[in-house]
Amino acid sequence: MQEFTKVTGVAAPMPLVNIDTDMIIPKQFLKTIQRSGLGKNLFDEMRYNPDGSEIPEFVLNQPAYRDAQIIVAGDNFGCGSSREHAPWALLDFGIRCVISTSFADIFYNNCFKNGILPIVMPPEVVEVLMEDARRGANARMTVDLEAQTVTTSDGQSFPFQVDSFRRHCLMNGLDDIGLTLEKAASIDGFERDLATLRPWV
């Protein structure tokens, strides 16, 4: 999993509330088990017309936000069905952080397991960040996981809280497999001891 320590980049404003996982990655793209390649279908029905042409008004189709790494979103982001393809698609597009007043629990947990930092902040702070994001490509927002702060392009800094274990995993690029591999020597030792004690197994 890709490490997350600090990201400075363009933040895309998405004030719509209740953006669900079917909006993030529609069901017709869930047949794959590959984590790569889903970025082109992120927000598919919001980004594209039925003929495949781009909808120019959609924020990620606008030149200022095509390379966004951060999304500042409306309330209850990631609600709906528990598809892990949603964070896969966000990450494949290049999104490393989503800031909102609240997230659906399963989506929130899946983000941490896939290298994305979901940040919960009070409504008044999210509104300040949303306004900063509306300034476009000239406005660079910084998300510092080590310091646990979000800093706007004009230098306003806001603290956020994140579970210490999840913070450790993100900063060290550890998903569930990575955490298991950290214990590889102990696991190998246990298996050797078990083979000695129970050679018939």
Curated annotation (Swiss-Prot):
Catalytic activity annotation: (2R,3S)-3-isopropylmalate = (2S)-2-isopropylmalate
EC code: 4.2.1.33
GO molecular function, one term: 3-isopropylmalate dehydratase activity
Pathway assigned in UniProt: Amino-acid biosynthesis; L-leucine biosynthesis; L-leucine from 3-methyl-2-oxobutanoate: step 2/4
Gene Ontology CC annotation, any one: 3-isopropylmalate dehydratase complex
Entry keyword annotation includes Kinase: no
UniProt entry tagged with the keyword Isomerase: no
UniProt GO BP: L-leucine biosynthetic process
Keywords of this entry: Amino-acid biosynthesis, Branched-chain amino acid biosynthesis, Leucine biosynthesis, Lyase
Family under the similarity heading: Belongs to the LeuD family. LeuD type 1 subfamily.
Cited PANTHER family: 3-ISOPROPYLMALATE DEHYDRATASE SMALL SUBUNIT, 3-ISOPROPYLMALATE DEHYDRATASE SMALL SUBUNIT 2-RELATED-RELATED
Binding partners and assembly: Heterodimer of LeuC and LeuD.
Function: Catalyzes the isomerization between 2-isopropylmalate and 3-isopropylmalate, via the formation of 2-isopropylmaleate.
NCBIfam families listed in its UniProt record: leuD (TIGR00171), PRK01641.1 (NF002458)
Name of the protein in its database record: 3-isopropylmalate dehydratase small subunit
Species annotation: Cereibacter sphaeroides (strain ATCC 17023 / DSM 158 / JCM 6121 / CCUG 31486 / LMG 2827 / NBRC 12203 / NCIMB 8253 / ATH 2.4.1.) (Rhodobacter sphaeroides)
